Amino acid sequence: MRLREGGARVDGVCVRVAMYLLDGVASWRELDVECCYRPEDPYAVRLDFGAGEQGAVWLLSRETLAAGLRGPAGDGDVHIAPSEGGDVFIALGGGAGVALLTTPAGALARFLAATDELVPAGTEASRINWDRCIQEFLSI
């Protein structure tokens, strides 16, 4: 798939995934989450939870997301773990608390497979423009 950014075409993967947010004691609210990956940022996956005041964007490690399909993974504000029913739990923490989400593991596995077609796991470092990174770092 191709992403459009500022009118220019950029190689990348962007898919919509249904996720469910724990909204109360035992009720779940469906969210339409856009999962995006760009080879220019090969270690990161972007989860976009929509626009407006209630919207949020999280950048997750692609490696952590993949590991969370197989077993508990994550540290700090992000934790991911598979469930016995074929879903994946994602806990995102921040100053306002923790959001607990669930989504079908198959949807995330297909998304990650598409990212691996663009940048195979383990080859991410070869996609980084290190000169540009150093230049940006030194200009801070």
Language-model features, listed with the residues they occupy:
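A short, structured beta-strand/loop element
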Residues: 44-46, 73-92
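Charge-rich, low-complexity N-terminal segments
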Residues: 1-42
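Short, surface-exposed linear segments at secondary-structure transitions and domain or protein termini
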Residues: 65-76, 108-115
